Amino acid sequence: KTWSVSVSDLLDELPGINTDGIGRVAFEPESGYVDPHAMVEAVVNQGVINGGEFTINNPVIGIDTSGNTSIVKTPAGDIETKIVINAAGPWAHQIGLWMDIDLPLEISREQDIMVRPNNDTSVITRCVSNMVDRTYIRAEPDGLVLVGTGHPKENKPANPDLYKKEADQEFVAETSRLLGHRFPSLSGSEVVKSWAGLYTITPDWNMILDRSPVHENHYLAVGGSGHSLKISPAMGQCLAEMIVFGEAKTVDISDLNARRFDTGQIVQSTYGGNRN
């Protein structure tokens, strides 16, 4: 549930916040967050229990689509298969080309910092998405505070095989400044680490979840645009239904079709991104 609350209510929850520029607040007391590493590890472990096989450090280097089946080429050998699913994240465009489809995907390098509060370790008691400063802030169990910046902002194109995995100094300085402005007691807090990862973005900032328009037994789950982790359980369920039954049963995913960018029927709503 989302509640619309006043600025005075916000001060009850976050007494250390500077309310300059804030006119209204959306409050979600039952919301939470997930540890991405632990979640992916749990999914992999359950997949192994159910008979799945996973390989690491064995990248796809090509796909032969000329026959009745596809041959996925890897350094460890070829894999012949009737069904190919492209869920390759920032490598999805290259994989798509091997699947004979040019996907409208852009890669952007996204950055975060982690700070150690100088003195007030209890100032952040909620996850904060600050639309005024375009920042997001979250306390970690070890007392550190995660800080990043939201959209709209300039995308930073990157090569998924070769990109800087730490935040830029300019980003660190500006994000630290924004944190100190919104939570004055955190001004000057030590930045203990930073990192950068990649978003794979579609033109409407919603993913493509569809059967390939080129090959019948090829499927696409690409372009999560920064929010695929939180919808991944439903995404996997719908994709499995599409493969087994010919269409998704749990929810209508037709708006996420691969052709929408050619027809102009893009998805109007979005979780975020550089859209008005």
For each predicted feature, which ranges?
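A short alpha-helix-loop-beta-strand transition element characteristic
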Residues: 1-8, 102-105, 188, 246-253
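Helix-loop-beta segment of a Rossmann-like dinucleotide-binding subdomain
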Residues: 2-50, 158-162, 216, 222-224
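General small-molecule cofactor/ligand-binding pocket signal
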Residues: 3-5, 53-55, 192
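A short, glycine/Asx- and small/polar-enriched loop/turn
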Residues: 14-22, 64-71, 201-205, 214-215
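Helical element adjacent to the flavin cofactor pocket in flavoenzyme catalytic cores
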Residues: 26-83
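C-terminal catalytic lobe of FAD-dependent flavoproteins
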Residues: 36, 177-276
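Central helical "cap/lid" subdomain
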Residues: 78-126, 250
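Active-site lid/adjacent beta-loop-alpha segment flanking the redox-cofactor pocket in flavoenzymes
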Residues: 102-104, 117-218
